[in-house]
């Protein structure tokens, strides 16, 4: 089913001193076209309900939302985008998207706790490539595949 619109929110993250550290852009709702059943548009949103194309579409809409926010000339600190293995592959294989992110100085990529490279802990080549585009943060440390070994092997700029 085709997606009609998205609803995003900005969730603040604060430093120890109480000052604003960053904003995380989160997808709160997705409204599908021609959906007339309760589950399609009225249930609480979950990325698990989306297929790969829809997940990539949501990510692209997040990038466009950041562009719109920049048009208001607000003084935003970093804005973080959640990145799982699918989105990582998309970023690294789409030259336009990777260059777009690299040109921005206000986007951090927040790596999902179940990221595929955390399984083997070898060379972490995808993380190295992503780090050339901007700051990398580790999301939900302690959950999923994250461990002390992960943060020993790769220097994240922020661990949440």
Regions found by a protein language model. Name each.
Residues 1-102:
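Bacterial c-di-GMP phosphodiesterase EAL domain
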Residues 100-160:
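The catalytic core of metal-dependent phosphodiesterases that act on cyclic dinucleotides
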């Amino acid at each position: 089913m085709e997606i009609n619109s998205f609803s995003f929110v900005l969730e603040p993250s604060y430093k120890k001193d109480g000052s604003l550290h960053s904003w995380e852009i989160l997808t709160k709702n997705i409204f599908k076209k021609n959906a007339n059943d309760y589950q399609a548009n009225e249930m609480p949103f979950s990325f698990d309900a989306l297929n790969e194309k829809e997940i990539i579409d949501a990510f692209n809409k997040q990038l466009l939302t950041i562009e719109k926010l920049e048009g208001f000339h607000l003084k935003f600190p970093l804005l973080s985008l959640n990145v799982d293995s699918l989105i990582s592959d998309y970023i690294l294989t789409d030259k336009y998207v990777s260059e777009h992110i690299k040109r921005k100085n206000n986007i951090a990529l927040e790596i999902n706790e179940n990221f595929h490279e955390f399984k083997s802990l070898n060379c972490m080549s995808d993380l190295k490539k992503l780090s050339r585009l901007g700051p990398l943060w580790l999301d939900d440390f302690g959950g999923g595949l994250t461990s002390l070994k992960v943060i020993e092997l790769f220097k994240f700029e922020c661990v949440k």
